[in-house]
């Protein structure tokens, strides 16, 4: 039976008189939720109802999270992809040098791309971006290690372009976005740049397309004062999703 009278007020209280559920009315509303109990072996349901297609918006407070079974529920939002230097390749023209550098025997070897201090050099990689990506801008961080104790600034840049089925791959990259990180002063120390500004992917990014990336060191820029090779260990790409999965 639909309860029309008496009308429920703005809240429902528990047996102690404390608020259990707060209710907010919307003028001329057409969408609502339906609560259904269930027989043995079945789960009760909370269903959005009203118009033909209605989302269900559950909003936690402050830094709270949506939970299921006591654990946070994964929702659409900011995600990361890690690209190690071993998954990149030096550009045919002015390519960075792919190297394997030993620290101490039986300790971690470093798979790196060496970017020169005096010449702009490039490396490339590609990703078939997840279907859940919102096709918006990206950001990135560079993970690297210095080849000297110099503490000058090192400038890295990243640019990208998306290609669909039957598109030519002989296409110009999008506008580069740079990030600057100062040498830490100790050889073989781990360095992680700050997160870059927004990188716009050229082309017409869409689900299922392959995105090509070009990473470079802007060694010829006046602001790049790091006087040795910058040894890139990898790049972390940040992207935003607008779907819970890639179905």
Spans of features found by a protein language model:
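Proprotein-processing/basic-patch segments
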Residues: 217-247
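Short beta-strands within extracellular/lumenal beta-sheet-rich domains
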Residues: 116-132, 137
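Short coil-to-beta strand junction motifs in C2/discoidin
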Residues: 150-157, 228-232
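A short beta-strand element within beta-rich, extracytoplasmic domains
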Residues: 136-146, 154
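Extracellular carbohydrate recognition and processing domains
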Residues: 168-203
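Beta-strand-rich, repetitive solenoid scaffolds
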Residues: 2-6, 10-16, 20-51, 55-61, ...
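Cysteine-clustered segments with highest specificity for TGF-beta superfamily mature ligands
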Residues: 191-222
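Short carbohydrate-recognition loop motifs
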Residues: 103-118
């Amino acid at each position: 039976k639909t309860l029309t009278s008496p009308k429920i007020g703005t809240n429902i209280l528990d047996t102690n008189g404390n608020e259990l559920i707060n209710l907010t009315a919307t003028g001329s509303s057409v969408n609502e939720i339906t609560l259904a109990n269930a027989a043995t072996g079945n789960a009760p349901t909370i269903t959005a109802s009203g118009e033909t297609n209605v989302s269900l918006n559950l909003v936690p407070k402050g830094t709270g999270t949506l939970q299921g079974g006591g654990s946070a529920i994964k929702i659409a939002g900011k995600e990361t992809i890690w690209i190690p230097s071993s998954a990149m390749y030096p550009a045919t023209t002015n390519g960075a040098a792919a190297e394997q550098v030993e620290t101490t025997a039986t300790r971690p070897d470093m798979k790196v791309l060496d970017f020169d201090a005096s010449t702009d050099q490039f490396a490339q990689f590609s990703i078939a971006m997840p279907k859940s990506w919102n096709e918006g801008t990206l950001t990135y961080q560079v993970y690297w290690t210095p080849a000297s104790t110099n503490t000058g600034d090192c400038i890295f840049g990243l640019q990208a372009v998306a290609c669909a089925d039957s598109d030519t791959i002989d296409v110009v990259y999008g506008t580069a976005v740079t990030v600057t990180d100062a040498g830490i002063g100790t050889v073989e120390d781990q360095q992680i740049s700050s997160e870059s500004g927004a990188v716009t992917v050229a082309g017409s990014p869409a689900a299922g397309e392959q995105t090509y990336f070009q990473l470079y060191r802007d060694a010829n820029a006046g602001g790049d004062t790091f006087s040795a090779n910058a040894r890139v260990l990898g790049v972390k790409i940040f992207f935003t999703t607008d779907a819970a999965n890639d179905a």
